Regions:
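Iron-sulfur cluster-binding electron-transfer modules in prokaryotic oxidoreductases
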Residues: 2-179
Length: 179
């Protein structure tokens, strides 16, 4: 994959709630990585927890509204929403897809979601931002060749087992990338 100039890579950064607490190293390493690669992350300070799939157990409307708000925060910056959490990417990505489909198939539902956002003084969801995982941005936007050139300490010979999280690779029909 060819690289894009790193100076053009800007994202609305959604760290998620776990990276602010139990996995602070994830937040810190993402900050250090983005700085080293020249990727600009505009942190969405007013973002809410995505609900990690639990909101929809109570109400699909709740999950869609909370995450439409998060996406709308990125849309106000005219940037794609970027997260490093596979669960956040999965939940927010599915909401984004569901609301984009609602624009065509069920505009009344989208009006309901945006009405709830408006009641809270939030910008409406428009479906213009998109949701990316950090790994997708590194591979697809930054490029593997450019990334390889930045390696300062190769880990050749290191045997490891990667765990990306299930939402990063499944459900395949809902993801913008091939595994």
């Amino acid at each position: 994959l060819s690289a894009m100039p790193s100076s053009s890579l800007r994202y609305a950064y959604f760290p998620g709630c776990v990276a602010q607490g139990a996995c602070r190293e994830l937040y810190q390493s993402t900050q250090l990585l983005s700085q080293a690669l020249g990727i600009e992350l505009i942190e969405l300070k007013k973002a809410s927890c995505c609900g990690s799939g639990t909101f929809k157990e109570d109400s699909q409307l709740l999950e869609d509204t909370v995450n439409a708000r998060n996406i709308a925060l990125a849309e106000t910056l005219n940037l794609p929403l970027l997260t490093h959490c596979s669960t956040c990417q999965g939940v927010i990505g599915h909401v984004d897809e569901r609301l984009k489909q609602a624009q065509q198939r069920n505009p009344a539902y989208l009006e309901q979601v945006n009405g709830l956002l408006q009641q809270q003084g939030c910008s409406p969801y428009q479906g213009t931002s998109g949701v990316k995982h950090l790994l997708w941005a590194l591979v697809g936007d930054y490029g593997l060749e450019a990334l390889a050139q930045k390696v300062t300490r190769p880990l050749s010979g290191l045997k490891c087992a990667a765990f990306y999280g299930c939402y990063l690779l499944r459900a395949q029909d809902h993801l913008p990338y091939d595994d």
